[in-house]
Amino acid sequence: MSIDDLKSKIPDFAKDVRLNLSSMASNETLTPQQKYGLFVACGIASRNADVRKALVAEAAGKVDASVIQAAKAAASIMGMNNVYYRFVHLASNKDYRTMPARLRMNVISNPGVDKVDFELWSLAVSAINGCGMCIDAHEDVLRKANVTAEAIQAAVRFASIIQSAAIALEAADTE
């Protein structure tokens, strides 16, 4: 399955989603590694099998397997961190902020790809998962690494488009 196959499954009520998928595929703000890593990480984070399969397949022919593995790792580790740190951030009891997380996160310091790219993917997944604390932390790392606001915005735009594709497919499944 490809992005074109995915677009063909998007119903007419979500025409904007189809158009946004097209614009995402032709984006030139990001490097190919950043773009296809976002496809994989956000496709997985969308929790929709069709979206995940299409975007992983799209990336498979365009980037090295190490990029795909690292993007999978970003989605996986953010699945854990986003739940934990969203709780820490939202809990009324602020004592949790001073407690050690006791969660293994070695992949963040050694992702097997450029750390900036991994941070970009982590930011996008954190946006999908709604963890403000993680969003702030990853955005701060990216800005300190001189990543442009346009690249950061593009990553989050990809996340929003990919998530909307998953929701459009779920909505179509109710008809």
Swiss-Prot record:
It is an enzyme of class 1 (oxidoreductase). Pfam families: CMD (PF02627). SUPFAM superfamilies: AhpD-like. InterPro entries: AhpD (IPR004674), AhpD-like (IPR029032), AhpD_core (IPR004675), CMD-like (IPR003779). It catalyses: N(6)-[(R)-dihydrolipoyl]-L-lysyl-[lipoyl-carrier protein] + a hydroperoxide = N(6)-[(R)-lipoyl]-L-lysyl-[lipoyl-carrier protein] + an alcohol + H2O. The active site is at 131 (proton donor), 134 (cysteine sulfenic acid (-soh) intermediate). One of its GO terms (biological process) is response to oxidative stress. The keyword Disulfide bond applies. Keywords: Antioxidant, Disulfide bond, Oxidoreductase, Peroxidase, Redox-active center. Disulfide bonds join 131-134. Its EC number is 1.11.1.28. GO terms for molecular function: alkyl hydroperoxide reductase activity; disulfide oxidoreductase activity; hydroperoxide reductase activity; peroxiredoxin activity. Belongs to the AhpD family. HAMAP family: AhpD (MF_01676). PANTHER family: ALKYL HYDROPEROXIDE REDUCTASE AHPD. This is Alkyl hydroperoxide reductase AhpD. It comes from Brucella canis (strain ATCC 23365 / NCTC 10854 / RM-666).
